[in-house]
């Protein structure tokens, strides 16, 4: 699943080609996504100039002169730029054609993504309850500590809760907990303020670095400029269950935690 760095990489890849451009038409080949693509999307968006491409959590917001397209990549979706009129392959569901001759093409084999229309995106039901962005001053270790009081759930699903902080998905939660030396199974309420301060620093560092490197290359992710990300080869824990820890050599353990695979080092993480 594309996580925050992948979505931000996509935003940075497509924004320069979209902002300031006028939409010539929208082609919806198959609108059966997680929520149906609006049947009148072509009417709503065609002829409008794209003002800004921004991101909130893992949602891309393509703001037009009137209204905003909210896009989510789901489990396997991607947005990339192609020449307008290029023949579509299977799973290439939507094209937003621009007067420049390019088209923003949405591909989603599993159909878990979304393309929705809103005149007030930040108050949309999918966005209004989201927590702070992790790379802003609104998120820090103090917030983690305060929100964790009384929480008996494990720390890993706690930091993956979008009401606590957005965009810390399975990959980056695993890596941040490894870097902070925290066992992902520990109860959130049992972790000290000092350790949460360290964890917040690592979340920010790892996400920022992943964005700089272009996200994490997994099976289905392609950046908005058509290039893959490069962070995967630098993972310390995620996907490395049964392999030696890169720090101490201890065999990494893989467990199920909150319905997700979680890998940790029994020596480095306490």
UniProtKB/Swiss-Prot annotation:
Binding locations of DNA: 91, 110, 151
Positions annotated as zinc finger (FPG-type): 236-270
Active-site residues from the entry: 2 (schiff-base intermediate with dna), 3 (proton donor), 58 (proton donor), 260 (proton donor)
GO terms classed as biological process: base-excision repair
Cofactor: Zn(2+)
Pfam families, sorted: Fapy_DNA_glyco, H2TH, zf-FPG_IleRS
GO molecular function, one term: damaged DNA binding
Cofactor note: Binds 1 zinc ion per subunit.
SMART domains from the UniProt entry: Fapy_DNA_glyco, H2TH
Keyword set includes DNA-binding: yes
Reactions listed under catalytic activity: Hydrolysis of DNA containing ring-opened 7-methylguanine residues, releasing 2,6-diamino-4-hydroxy-5-(N-methyl)formamidopyrimidine; 2'-deoxyribonucleotide-(2'-deoxyribose 5'-phosphate)-2'-deoxyribonucleotide-DNA = a 3'-end 2'-deoxyribonucleotide-(2,3-dehydro-2,3-deoxyribose 5'-phosphate)-DNA + a 5'-end 5'-phospho-2'-deoxyribonucleoside-DNA + H(+)
Keywords, in A-Z order: DNA damage, DNA repair, DNA-binding, Glycosidase, Hydrolase, Lyase, Metal-binding, Multifunctional enzyme, Zinc, Zinc-finger
EC number: 3.2.2.23, 4.2.99.18
Family: Belongs to the FPG family.
Subunit: Monomer.
Function: Involved in base excision repair of DNA damaged by oxidation or by mutagenic agents. Acts as a DNA glycosylase that recognizes and removes damaged bases. Has a preference for oxidized purines, such as 7,8-dihydro-8-oxoguanine (8-oxoG). Has AP (apurinic/apyrimidinic) lyase activity and introduces nicks in the DNA strand. Cleaves the DNA backbone by beta-delta elimination to generate a single-strand break at the site of the removed base with both 3'- and 5'-phosphates.
PANTHER family, per the entry: FORMAMIDOPYRIMIDINE-DNA GLYCOSYLASE
HAMAP family in the record: Fapy_DNA_glycosyl
Protein name per Swiss-Prot or TrEMBL: Formamidopyrimidine-DNA glycosylase
Gene: mutM
């Amino acid at each position: 699943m594309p996580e925050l760095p992948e979505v931000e990489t996509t935003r940075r890849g497509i924004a320069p080609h979209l902002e300031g451009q006028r939409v010539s038409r929208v082609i919806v080949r198959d609108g059966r996504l997680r929520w149906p693509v609006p049947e009148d999307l072509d009417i709503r968006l065609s002829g409008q100039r794209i003002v800004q491409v921004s991101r909130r959590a893992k949602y891309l917001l393509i703001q037009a002169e009137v209204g905003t397209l909210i896009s989510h990549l789901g489990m396997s979706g991607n947005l990339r730029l192609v020449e307008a009129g290029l023949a579509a392959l299977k799973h290439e569901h939507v094209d937003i054609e621009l007067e420049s001759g390019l088209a923003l093409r949405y591909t989603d084999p599993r159909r878990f993504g979304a393309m929705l229309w809103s005149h007030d995106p930040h108050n949309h039901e999918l966005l209004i309850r989201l927590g702070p962005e992790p790379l802003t001053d609104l998120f820090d270790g103090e917030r983690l500590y305060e929100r964790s009081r009384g929480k008996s759930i494990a720390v890993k699903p706690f930091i993956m809760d979008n009401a606590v902080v957005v965009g810390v998905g399975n990959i980056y939660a695993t890596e941040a907990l490894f870097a902070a030396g925290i066992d992902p199974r520990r109860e959130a309420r049992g972790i000290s303020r000092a350790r949460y301060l360290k964890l917040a620093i690592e979340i920010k560092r790892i996400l920022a670095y992943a964005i700089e490197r272009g996200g994490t290359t997994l099976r289905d992710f392609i950046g908005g400029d058509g290039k893959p990300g490069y962070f995967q080869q630098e993972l310390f824990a995620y996907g490395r269950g049964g392999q030696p820890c890169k720090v101490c050599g201890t065999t990494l353990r893989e467990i199920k935690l909150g319905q997700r695979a979680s890998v940790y080092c029994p020596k480095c993480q306490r």
